[in-house]
Amino acid sequence: TARSRGLGDVYKRQLLGGFTLVRSANPLDVVTLNSPLELVVTIIHPEIEVKTADARAVLLDKLHLKQAIAQTANLGALVTGLFKEDYELIRRSLVDHIVEPVRSMLIPGFNELKNRANEAGALGTGISGSGPSVFALSKGMDIAQKVGLAMQKVYDEIRVPYDTHISPINSKGVKIL
């Protein structure tokens, strides 16, 4: 089952929609967070495989206290920014000090994707899960579409096939049609 493979929290987050915070994996405790109505996500998925085992293998076993403090501060600020609909606080808090520096090496053109997305107006850009998808959050659909074009240009230049998806944050989760 998904739970026995350690993926239960992933599937539950996908079913709930929106932003979720996994407070505990055992027992599973997931908190749903509100998000601003104008928040839009752009996701670019390079057609490459990054195995979860490989993505986990590059993670460091130990953290420096400064990294943990910075990451925790950014998480708290992100939750606050979402709650207060403070886009500038969201922008300042979308910095990953722990996972992104090592996992970004597994994703072709990651740094250029991030730079161009942010230059195009993204609030912030990061790795979705264990990769290889890269997400960018934007205020409004117009900016999100510009961000998508900027990211696509990077992969066009380095000849990496990709899919792109742009959507408002779905706070409702999965629906049966």
Regions found by a protein language model. Give the residues of each.
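A generic local secondary-structure boundary/capping motif
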Residues: D9-K12, L28-N34, V79, G124-T125
